[in-house]
Regions:
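Short amphipathic alpha-helices in soluble, non-transmembrane regions
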Residues: 364-370, 408-413
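Conserved core of the PLP fold type I
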Residues: 61, 67-212, 223-246, 361, ...
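Walker B catalytic acidic pair
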Residues: 220
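Conserved glycine-rich beta-strand-loop-beta hairpin in the small C-terminal domain of fold type I
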Residues: 314-328, 340-355, 369
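Conserved PLP-binding active-site segment of the aspartate aminotransferase-like
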Residues: 353-359, 375-417
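N-terminal "arm"/small-domain region of PLP-dependent enzymes with the aminotransferase-like
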Residues: 2-76, 80-81, 86-87, 370-373
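Conserved core segment of the aminotransferase class I/II
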Residues: 99, 240-321, 334, 421
Length: 438
């Protein structure tokens, strides 16, 4: 197809009329389509319903070490759950704390504890004049919401095909001791689907931060969330790399089963060094006597081991893969060659990142909404909701049924075409006016 930038103004105006007529047809369909969040579909949730049957009133809820899961105790989680999640996180069970149902909650608590009590004896962040976090962009809006809530200044770090711009990360953390952390989704990153390269992970491990309490917040939310059996991204293990590099305490690694079993009813965990674990446990013992051991046991008895979890994730992939491929197919068919957008082609995770022409993302999302399609708000993938170029849109294919998803993507492509034409025509009009004003 001919790039829009090469078409004459008259050709674009005529095409705009045709596209507007198609848009009015969509508006007349009274659509109610939702692609705003990366939620598992009903079909995916049904995959885990057998978990509701693995425990009954007749079952023995005693662990291998004799722990009665019905009672108080076991602050850091039952042994069996640590072994299962340890295999998922590629970390020995001794370096894991099993929490409740939300890894986001664990991350919030970790930042909150650093604010009020400091990290391993360092000054609490609340007593410092300035606290900063590095934020790879585009990134996860709920990460940014945590640091914004605590009044932490956020600094954008551009994402590359290999992960964050490590030249920038290395320079900033080395020269500024007010930088206390960086948010990372290292595998099938939200929203680009990028996985960090081996060299990027090793450069993270070799960081020389000015702040002794600097920590990498390594949210490996999509560690086992592949779309394909053989064509998969692989991530080297960050804690082992940090230990080899002489920085054993520099990483907090987070994960959960939210997009494996039931969102909001899974189990979450943190993996980190022994020093960090001891620091966390000092606070945790005042916060809780122990998390939901019955749910931990339920997960262990359902999945049995990492092999059972991997097989379960293949079923998720069978549902998700056609949806991701439908999105990519629509984008390539409708927008390929037009020069008005680029998009990622992830091998896993839950999102596809789309980048429009400068200054068009908000208008595209707004136009979609007027025709019945709700998407993630433009700008949400940047701190403070401010995309400096207004280009990035997060596409979440997981929740809608396939037929609705295809319809939604047809509408999205149509809105992208209309907004892009308007942008090109406006730029041309502005360019013509400029010499006259001069």
């Amino acid at each position: 197809m001919q790039p829009y930038a090469e078409m004459s103004t008259e050709e674009l105006q005529e095409l705009r009329k045709q596209l507007s007529a198609q848009y009015k047809e969509f508006q007349g369909k009274d659509l109610r389509l939702d692609m705003s969040r990366g939620k598992p579909s009903v079909e995916q949730l049904d995959l885990s319903m057998g978990m509701m049957d693995v425990l009954s009133s007749n079952d023995d809820l005693t662990c291998e070490d004799g722990t009665d899961c019905r009672n108080y105790g076991v602050l850091t989680g039952i042994k069996e759950a640590k072994e299962l999640i340890g295999d998922m996180m590629e970390v020995a069970p001794d370096y894991i704390i099993i929490y409740g149902n939300s890894s986001l909650n664990v991350m919030f608590d970790t930042v909150s504890r650093s604010m009020t009590h400091g990290v391993m004896g360092c000054t609490p962040w609340c007593k410092l004049d300035k606290v900063k976090f590095l934020c790879p962009v585009p990134g996860y809006d709920r990460h940014f919401a945590i640091t914004q809530y605590f009044g932490i200044e956020m600094i954008n770090v551009p994402m590359t095909p290999d992960g964050p711009d490590m030249d920038m990360v290395e320079r900033l953390v080395a020269e500024d001791d007010s930088i206390k952390g960086i948010w990372c989704v290292p595998k099938y990153s939200n929203p680009t689907g990028t996985s960090y390269s081996d060299e990027t992970v090793r450069r993270f491990a070799r960081l020389k931060p000015a702040a002794p309490d600097f920590r990498i917040y390594w949210d490996n939310a999509y560690g086992v969330h592949h779309l394909y059996d053989h064509d998969q991204d692989h991530l080297i293990e960050i804690l082992a790399e940090c230990k080899r590099a002489g920085n054993p305490d520099m990483v907090y690694k987070f994960a959960s089963t939210s997009k494996i079993s039931f969102p909001g009813s899974g189990i979450a965990a943190i993996a980190t060094s022994r020093n960090n674990l001891e620091d966390i446990e000092k606070q945790l013992k005042f916060q809780t006597i122990g998390h939901d051991k019955v749910n931990q046991l339920r997960h262990v008895r359902y999945f049995k081991d990492i092999h059972g979890m991997v097989e379960h994730m293949r079923k998720h992939a069978d549902i998700l893969r056609p949806k991701f491929e439908a999105v990519i197919d629509t984008l390539e068919r409708e927008l390929g060659g037009l020069g008005i957008g680029t998009w990622t082609k992830p091998k896993g995770g839950y999102f596809i990142a789309f980048d429009s022409l400068d200054g068009c993302a908000k208008a595209i999302v707004a136009r979609c909404k007027k025709a019945g399609l709700v998407m993630t708000g433009a700008g949400a993938t940047y701190p403070y909701g401010k995309d400096p170029h207004d280009t990035n849109i997060r596409i979440a294919p997981s929740y809608p049924p396939l037929g609705d998803l295809i319809l939604a993507m047809d509408l999205f492509a149509l809105c992208t075409k209309i907004v892009s034409i308007d942008k090109i025509l406006k730029d041309r009009a502005d360019a013509q006016e400029a010499p006259e004003q001069a």
